[in-house]
């Protein structure tokens, strides 16, 4: 309340200087105080000068000030930042004074949040660095390390010893320079590439093509020494100490970083969305830097391995010329393969065995809030929270949000836009994807199969292409990528992330299933559970047209290449933390009665009876409360607190455990081997369950 008065006082003080009457005398913290001048009704009397510049009143604050009316752009008022927004329409002036709440978190909490982001980013990058998506660049990285062993190191010295040491140091540092260049260019291009190209009015794939040309030039320079001399000639006028030697490797790393396309995940999605929407803050920069660093460490290992092999194996030392030719050839081959998108076929063929690890480090509520993976809540999308990820039955999650800010369409008559309202009466599947996303490339064959099988039965599919990288904003690239994947259904180009944000999306890929009345009935983030999605599609088609004849399910003929986790991910019961709830009804805070669904998806759980849910866990609120769990593990542990008994039913055999005291871990299954099974847990009234973990 005190802070609100301070903000209002600060706003009123500035308003009185400009002769403006406050629009309201009091506002709550949720609704900031606003002072405005309608167009043409008055001028600001505190006008200082025209032309933008630094405020000469240094005692206030060194911030930009408005050259049209002299308003100071920022003024701190208690816990608020008072921002002045000035617009000029024709010859009339409209000024607005707005008090905006500042970050309410204490300094220690803000530091902790940044450190958490750094840890999450590093772990996410490290997991990405051991994923199949790095395979295309591994040969170049390996040979870049092997090539770092200069032939001069094995020749007899003819000059000064100091020269040999300097050359040896340069060769030793080459792997680090290659990886350093990769980290720098990957981070900069991911965050700033799209904005920079837009400012310069260049094609969105200009950076990619420039990197491909640079990669070919570097490869040719390694093969042909005379060509390398031509490349170095522009630097000949630079003082000798500053010339980049041919064993530097930093330029090679810069080119590789631009072309490096890691597997999509929640952390990379947060970075890409922040860069594309120009919402870059300290947290985004920290997340990007630590993600790039984590992803680079495994690559550095391969580069150092190549260097060590070259040092230890005599054949490498004696054949440095051949090593240079091999490195150049592999570099050029990689560039040619990237032009024709050949590495994607290899990446699709090898399942991403790290996907479940990516999900586990980014599913916590606090982490998801910091990554801003949930998008912006508005009147159109607020009810999407009623849908749980990958539920095995239909849910009701509000009217489907609009397809906003679409910059173009493909695969429609005349490339004209489609309005969702025009599709009422049909079942609609909205599929978020990106053509270079390996996860999407494994999922799209199923979407294509559904479209081909059910388009004559009333199914409409719209692929919303939201780019991960700047070159994916080029319509021609998207069209080519769609053709390679066999996509013939309409594609909406969401280059500005407007529809992505309006749907509060989190992942590539993501599916939103909409019934014939325009209501969202199912949401699935990521790969997998294709049989569940197709079953729900068929159910909605039957609801829309009772008696319609449907073909055989396509999921029986399309192989599921989704990587399977070795164990079921940790199961949380807290509202906001739950990610694998497969039961009926909304999983919201408060007391409610639940029932088991007819079928339960793998690696999910459902509730029965009355439960009281909060942001910590789920409390048994009746004598019939129970949990059904489908899991894949050898051992199962439950974290539970309170006083009572826990009855565990496995294979029809009940076993009772006494529970007493604060929350702690209890083992409920001790298996002999890894298996997929169903378990029922019946906690007595008053026990609070927090999570399941697996071993």
UniProtKB/Swiss-Prot annotation:
It is found in: Cell membrane. InterPro entries: AhpC/TSA (IPR000866), Cyt_c_assmbl_TM_dom (IPR003834), Thioredoxin-like_sf (IPR036249), Thioredoxin_10 (IPR041017), Thioredoxin_domain (IPR013766), Thioredoxin_ResA/DsbE_sf (IPR050553). It is a multi-pass membrane protein. Residues 394-542 form the Thioredoxin domain. PROSITE patterns: THIOREDOXIN_2. SUPFAM superfamilies: Thioredoxin-like. The keyword Transcription regulation does not apply. GO terms for biological process: cytochrome complex assembly. GO terms for molecular function: antioxidant activity; oxidoreductase activity. CDD domains: TlpA_like_DipZ_like. The chain crosses the membrane at residues 123-143, 179-199, 205-225, 254-274, 285-305, 325-345. The keyword Coiled coil does not apply. Its main location: membrane. It holds the Pfam family Thioredoxin_10. GO terms for cellular component: plasma membrane. It comes from the Bacteria. Keywords: Cell membrane, Membrane, Transmembrane, Transmembrane helix. This is Protein DipZ. It comes from Mycobacterium tuberculosis (strain ATCC 25618 / H37Rv). The gene is dipZ.
């Amino acid at each position: 309340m005190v802070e609100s008065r301070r903000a209002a006082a600060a706003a009123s003080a500035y308003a009185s200087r400009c002769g403006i009457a406050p629009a309201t005398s009091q506002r709550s913290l949720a609704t900031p105080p606003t002072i405005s001048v309608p167009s043409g009704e008055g001028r600001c009397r505190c006008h200082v000068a025209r032309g933008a510049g630094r405020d000469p009143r240094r005692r206030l604050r060194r911030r930009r000030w408005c050259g049209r009316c002299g308003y100071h752009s920022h003024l701190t008022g208690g816990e608020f930042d008072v921002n002045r927004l000035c617009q000029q329409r024709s010859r009339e002036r409209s000024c607005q004074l707005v008090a905006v709440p500042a970050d309410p978190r204490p300094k220690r909490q803000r530091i902790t949040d940044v450190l958490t982001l750094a840890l999450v980013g590093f772990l996410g990058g490290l997991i990405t660095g051991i994923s199949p998506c790095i395979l295309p660049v591994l040969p170049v990285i390996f040979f870049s390390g092997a090539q770092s062993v200069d032939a001069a190191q094995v020749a007899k010295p003819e000059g000064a010893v100091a020269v040999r040491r300097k050359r040896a140091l340069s060769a030793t540092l080459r792997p680090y320079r290659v990886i350093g260049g990769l980290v720098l260019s990957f981070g900069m291009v991911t965050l700033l590439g799209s904005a920079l190209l837009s400012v310069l009015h260049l094609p969105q794939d200009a950076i990619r093509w420039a990197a491909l040309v640079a990669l070919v030039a570097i490869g040719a320079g390694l093969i042909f020494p005379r060509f390398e001399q031509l490349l170095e000639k522009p630097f000949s006028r630079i003082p000798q100490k500053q010339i980049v030697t041919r064993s530097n490797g930093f330029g090679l790393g810069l080119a590789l970083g631009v072309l490096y396309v890691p597997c999509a995940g929640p952390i990379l999605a947060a970075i890409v969305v922040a860069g594309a929407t120009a919402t870059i803050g300290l947290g985004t920069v920290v997340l990007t830097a630590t993600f790039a660093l984590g992803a680079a460490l495994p690559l550095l290992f391969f580069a150092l391995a190549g260097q060590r092999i070259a040092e230890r194996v005599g054949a490498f030392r004696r054949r440095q010329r051949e090593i240079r030719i091999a490195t150049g050839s592999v570099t050029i081959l990689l560039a040619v393969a990237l032009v024709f998108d050949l590495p994607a076929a290899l990446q699709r063929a090898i399942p991403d065995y790290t996907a479940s690890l990516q999900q586990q480090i980014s599913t916590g509520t606090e982490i998801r809030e910091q990554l801003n993976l949930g998008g912006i809540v508005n009147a159109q999308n607020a009810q999407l929270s009623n849908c749980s990820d990958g539920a095995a039955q239909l849910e009701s999650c509000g009217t489907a949000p609009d397809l906003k800010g679409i910059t173009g369409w493909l695969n429609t008559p005349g490339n004209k836009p489609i309005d969702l309202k025009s599709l009422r009466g049909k079942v609609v599947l909205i599929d978020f994807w990106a053509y270079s996303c390996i996860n999407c490339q494994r999922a799209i064959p199923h979407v294509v199969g559904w479209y081909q099988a059910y388009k004559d039965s009333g199914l409409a599919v719209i692929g919303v292409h939201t780019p991960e990288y700047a070159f994916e904003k080029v319509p021609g690239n998207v069209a080519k990528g769609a053709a390679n994947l066999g996509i013939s259904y309409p594609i909406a180009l969401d280059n500005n992330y407007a529809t992505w944000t309006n749907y509060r999306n989190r992942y590539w890929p993501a599916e939103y299933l909409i019934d014939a009345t325009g209501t969202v009935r199912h949401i699935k983030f990521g790969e997998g559970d294709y049989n569940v999605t197709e079953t729900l599609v068929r159910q909605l088609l039957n609801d829309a047209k009772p008696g319609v004849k449907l073909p055989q399910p396509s999921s029986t003929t399309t192989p599921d290449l989704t990587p399977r986790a070795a164990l079921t991910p940790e199961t949380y019961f807290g509202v906001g933390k739950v990610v694998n709830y497969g039961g009926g009804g909304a999983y919201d805070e408060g007391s409610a009665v639940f029932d088991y669904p007819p079928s339960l998806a793998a690696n999910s759980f459902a509730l029965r009876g009355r439960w009281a849910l909060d942001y910590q866990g789920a409390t048994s609120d009746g004598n019939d409360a129970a949990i059904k769990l489908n899991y894949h593990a050898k051992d199962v542990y439950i974290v539970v607190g309170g006083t009572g008994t826990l009855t565990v039913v496995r294979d029809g055999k009940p076993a009772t455990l006494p529970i007493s005291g604060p929350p702690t871990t209890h083992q409920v299954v001790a298996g002999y081997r890894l298996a997929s099974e169903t378990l029922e847990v019946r906690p007595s009234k008053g026990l609070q369950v927090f999570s399941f973990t697996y071993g």
